[in-house]
């Protein structure tokens, strides 16, 4: 098991490994906008090019990894952000590494949102003026049912994915709009500990802005059915707004943010360094542990100010004043953050074109990654970091099976005109997955092979259990071990007899010794 790291700068792109020296430079890659690269399945990497209406496709799958561009996909205009909505309903197959996800979302600097179907290349919908200014990030969550966009207009908008793919003639409308920030919202994060439904999920949304604040929202205050109640939603907008739980103020403008998978901590990158904010805050010197992202009964927004830890801090007094003492992991200006699989290390990208692999517990820099180039990269900031786990043995075995197939099918071209969902033909090119070997074994089991027969057998077993008396199946250990115990008793008797003989012999020897000792004393006394 290894972790693959792909990162881009304004002029370069590099694919490397976190635990080895393997490196590959992705050629003809230039992107100056953050969140403009996305991994599509386990095979492809999409990178939106700067100042070009073009998406470069790279093959990054194991032995077939190529440094050159595999394919170029033209787009209607320059794309700044990309996001993939995975097809979570597909069964696992033996060639899952080569399956394509379902939707590709792209945004522009003018605030538009494009939605393509990757298997056909059809442009399903275009949302004009989704934001008043450029979109900085697109984030899908809850298995792609919803996605969130943040923009330079200081707004955060929640969308429902089905509105972009349905045959409804009306254009997609947002579920809710958050406008608590004052400047550009650079990053957003959604907690992974949530339920299946939005209204009862308990999911937390974190937003980071250049106004030096991080805001935490609770999605549980959203209703579950959004499309049927559009009119009532417009009449009572507050009812559909997520609840603002807490606001954290930092000493500098926030550029990037990363949330721990278990919601234990929030890592905030600013122009002055990287801060570690524990969401379960322990007040040193006391037994108090505060859940900073928990809803309070007063329905009031909690305000906290983050300060750097010192030697003589009175944590109890500072916490009573709303100040949180946090550790500063690194002092380099941060542009991009990404946690590793086990969340023990964090990759910190800076504006100098380098990535520092920092161990969170010790605050030590374990490794430094930078592009393999002779050009001056002092002002070549990191724009994208993608970390994925790689099972080398499984990947190599799959690739060997398909090594002889040289006729690789190209990806469908992304359409420039919105697809007519009512009259036009909808052709989808899709590679049918092979059934894995373990699925045949599962199909032979009773519940899957014949469910009705399995339920009949369960009913008959239940009837027998209820009508018959309970019989004990406990073994009588004493009865079974009776012959063995009898033989053991004979051995014990023999040993006891031998022991008695030894005791009697010892007693005789002792008496003889005592008599001889008395005679010896008498002899000594007579000689005196």
UniProtKB/Swiss-Prot annotation:
Leader peptide range in chain numbering: none
PROSITE patterns: WD_REPEATS_2, WD_REPEATS_REGION
Biological processes annotated in GO: pre-replicative complex assembly involved in nuclear cell cycle DNA replication; regulation of DNA-templated DNA replication initiation; ribosomal large subunit assembly; rRNA processing
WD repeats, residue ranges: 79-126, 130-169, 188-227, 249-290
GO MF: chromatin binding
Top-level lineage group: Eukaryota
Localization of this protein: Nucleus
GO cellular component, one term: nuclear pre-replicative complex
Alphabetized UniProt keyword annotations: Nucleus, Repeat, Ribosome biogenesis, rRNA processing, WD repeat
Pfam families: WD40 (PF00400)
Keyword Cell membrane: no
Family listed: Belongs to the WD repeat IPI3/WDR18 family.
Function statement: Component of the RIX1 complex required for processing of ITS2 sequences from 35S pre-rRNA.
Subunit: Component of the RIX1 complex, composed of IPI1, RIX1/IPI2 and IPI3 in a 1:2:2 stoichiometry. The complex interacts (via RIX1) with MDN1 (via its hexameric AAA ATPase ring) and the pre-60S ribosome particles.
Name of the protein in question: Pre-rRNA-processing protein IPI3
Lineage: Eukaryota, Fungi, Dikarya, Ascomycota, Saccharomycotina
